[in-house]
A protein has these predicted regions:
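Conserved beta-strand scaffold positions in the cores of enzyme catalytic domains, especially
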Residues: 6, 35-37, 105
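Extended hydrophobic secondary-structure segments that form protein cores and membrane-embedded regions
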Residues: 34-40, 138
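Short, flexible active-site-adjacent loop segments at beta-strand->alpha-helix junctions, enriched
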Residues: 10, 88-89, 111, 145, ...
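Conserved acidic segment of CheY-like receiver
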Residues: 2-21, 57
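Short helix-loop-beta junction
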Residues: 22-28, 172
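Conserved binding/recognition cores within well-folded domains
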Residues: 120-174
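Acidic phosphotransfer microenvironment of two-component signaling modules
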Residues: 11, 39-45
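CheY-like receiver
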Residues: 29-33, 43-130
Length: 174
């Protein structure tokens, strides 16, 4: 399962993002996708308190207090693919730095054509990494449902019981 988190200033942008990512995901992977879409930073932060597994993050840095929030979140999700959504009013010096380290950039106003192009590039890079068996600092579970990458720093413990192996993170057991 691949988990996607989006924080956008408008619901329309989130809807367009989900649609574009779904289209590209259907073409490129057989994995199940889980989407978490937010228009408020506070809601996203509340969701992230549980430290869920996230593979891809899209974050709008034009929203108030979004950059400091993104820096805090990025500490826990260094290995997640990060797409920053920005506009001309924000200097690239704000979001192009080691504390944030975005993987791609989408400029506002978000048009369907630009979004499709950026999502296409993102999916190329992400699926290349996902198909690569050697993902550093991650535990890989392959099953009939697909691959699940669990960052080692999010694993609480691994337990063998009932002739199966269980991996426990803060929020889930696999």
């Amino acid at each position: 399962m691949i988990t996607f988190l989006s924080v956008a200033s408008k619901k329309e942008e989130n809807d367009l993002m989900r649609e574009s990512v779904r289209e590209q995901a259907a073409l490129r992977t057989d994995e199940r996708w889980k989407f978490h879409m937010f228009e408020k930073i506070s809601e996203a932060e509340n969701f992230l308190e549980e430290v869920p597994l996230l593979d891809i993050i899209s974050w709008d840095v034009t929203m108030k207090k979004s950059v400091p929030s993104l820096e805090r979140i990025r500490r826990d999700y260094r290995q997640s693919y990060l797409m920053v959504v920005a506009d001309g009013s924000i200097s690239p010096m704000v979001y192009l730095r080691p504390g944030i380290m975005p993987s791609s950039l989408l400029l506002k106003p978000v048009s369907r054509e630009n979004l499709v192009m950026v999502v296409n590039e993102m999916m190329d890079a992400f699926t290349e990494k996902f198909d690569n068996k050697d993902v550093p600092e991650s535990f890989v579970i392959e099953s009939r449902e697909g691959k699940q990458y669990i960052p080692l720093n999010q694993i609480y413990y691994i337990e063998a019981r009932e002739k199966k192996i269980f991996i426990r993170t803060k929020q889930e057991e696999y």
